[in-house]
């Protein structure tokens, strides 16, 4: 995802964080797949705060976005792992995103 000024969020974080190598690999994959013009693909970018410690559970209430984090009233980009599953299942059952990245948050 991108910052408000269009930079990749991953490039703005401290590079010694444990998840940086995997996050950069997914960014590289997105850069490759977005050049694909024949395949109908969708690329899901998880919320910046998405992990099992978020105990909201499954709400089914989320908002969608594309290149920028979906922020709540307090400026957080958060989604429970249960609602990530709902977002992806909803997209599979009723595709709304074609050849584009999408994300979700509360």
Model-derived regions: residue spans:
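Oxidoreductase cofactor-interface core, primarily capturing Rossmann-like NAD(P)-dependent enzymes
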Residues: 1-106
């Amino acid at each position: 995802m991108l910052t408000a000024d269009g930079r990749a969020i991953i490039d703005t974080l401290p590079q010694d964080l444990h998840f940086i190598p995997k996050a950069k690999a997914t960014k590289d994959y997105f850069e490759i797949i977005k050049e694909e013009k024949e395949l109908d693909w969708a690329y899901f970018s998880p919320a910046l705060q998405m992990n099992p410690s978020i105990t909201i559970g499954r709400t089914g209430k989320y908002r969608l976005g594309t290149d920028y984090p979906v922020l709540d009233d307090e400026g957080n980009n958060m989604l429970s792992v249960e609602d990530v599953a709902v977002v992806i299942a909803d997209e599979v059952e009723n595709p709304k995103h074609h050849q584009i990245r999408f994300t979700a948050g509360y």
